[in-house]
Amino acid sequence: METDQLNSGNIHIGHLIEAQLKRDERSVSWLARQIPCTRNHVYKILRRPSLDCALLLRISKAMQFNFFQYYAQDVGDAVTERLG
């Protein structure tokens, strides 16, 4: 997981989406057309630390990337920590 996007187990999903857009060489305008919404709304999404699951699913499908994996890893780490 990208440590600059995580803070003591807290996931900032907006930053992770933004980083993936850059890796994929996709623009905010492209994502806005895919999900569909305005560019301004996408910029707001990128600033948000958490998102509604339905919106995250739309983004994951549009970008063909499973953003839920970050949450699954975070839960797995917490369970491992708890069980020792």
Where does each model-flagged region fall?
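A short, Lys/Arg-rich alpha-helix, primarily the initiator
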Residues: 1-26
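Short, charged recognition helix plus adjacent turn
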Residues: 2-8, 71-84
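Residues within the alpha-helical elements of helix-turn-helix
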Residues: 23, 34, 62
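Short alpha-helical "recognition helix" segments of helix-turn-helix
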Residues: 30-32
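Recognition helix of helix-turn-helix/homeodomain-like DNA-binding domains
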Residues: 35-51
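Short, basic-rich loop-to-helix N-cap that marks the start of a DNA-contacting helix
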Residues: 48-61
